[in-house]
Amino acid sequence: PVIDAEAQQNIQKHIDQMRSKGHKVHQLMFNQDAYELAQGTFIPPTLIELPNLNDLEREVFGPVLHLISYKAGQLPQLLDQINTKGYGLTMGLHTRIDETMQTVISKAHVGNLYINRNIVGAVVGVQPFGGEGLSGTGPKAGGPLYIYRLMHQVSEKKLAQPYAMNSAQATLENPLLQEFKAWVYKTFPTISLTTPAKITTGHSFSLQGPTGEENQYMILPRESVLSLATNDADQIQQLLAILSVGSRPAVLADNTFILKHLQSMPAKVVKAIKVIKDMESSDFEAVLHHGDASALIDL
């Protein structure tokens, strides 16, 4: 059974389309009684053979497995094709070859990657669950950031390290952040900067789990974050927050702060800032907004 009639219809429509395109569709179920099947929203377990990934245009949430075979040595290219689709909820890998593991770990853009284990039934606190890209992003259900996100309306809270870090090496401050802060203090000597909550990106953290199982948790920055503010202080604070997590700041071309100060910033900071023409035709993954409620509604 799937969640509702609409989901059933959408999944069945996809299966019918794949069959009409000439792809091999395999279905098997124990009970084929039409009357009993009509009493619920059932989809039989379905296997669809595809010649390549281009024939799959979207995620299909249901008991449908698409099978694509590839030749040895083509795995990196296949992973690139998967990443290009933009969806990245869960990926599973079964292999004894360490090189294959490292290839998938380094190239896969997914929220959860399971190696030599079950890919469903994520355990709270052990396997935080959440996707990447078009499959959704966020604090991950059951993860160490989840309760912090649920407490976003609490005025006094602090994000401490809720897990043990693999490496004992201290995390150095982003060089771009250092240069930007030095420029701010020189250009705006009276400004008081608020240090953003410390969120370490790009490092693996160990989570608890049963003996013989290893669970690694990594926080990755959004690639590009649009900064929208109505005054210099807020604009500076936003750029500080974006750079502090390793993201690339994006600003609108008519931004008064950027028009006035961009050329005086350090060259590396200028290179890191992405100036975009408009929001409708430009790429960015998140927005930081300082302004009143009406401006936010318009946005």
Question: Where are the predicted features?
Answer:
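Short beta-strand to alpha-helix junction loop
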Residues: 2-11
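Conserved C-terminal structural/oligomerization subdomain of aldehyde/semialdehyde dehydrogenase
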Residues: 15, 20, 32-299
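Local beta-strand/beta-hairpin segments that build beta-sheet-rich folds
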Residues: 24-29
